[in-house]
């Protein structure tokens, strides 16, 4: 009897663990164009965004000037981000903006994860954003 109860408990535990929410992967870049992205340039720029941001050979290409950024048109939460990048030539000041707040301005309220050679992984608070330690 004890073995039957133990087997039943193990089966129920296995079923409950396998019923958990599965992670789904969503590609943010389709490799063809910038559909699903919003490109923002410094308001003093006279260039169209298409002269700065584009797609070449399945990769996003960004010209270094003027200042600006790209963001996804859709908002995400509870996410994991995987990014790959490389510099052709000497790396310059660049980064990934995280938790960008509404309002497409330069510089937005956001956290920047620095990608510049020698500073990769540093966090920079942009647009007056603040970070605080929360005790639990």
Predicted regions and their residues:
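Bacterial Sec-dependent N-terminal signal peptides
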Residues: 1-24
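Carbohydrate-interacting regions of secretory-pathway proteins
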Residues: 19-136
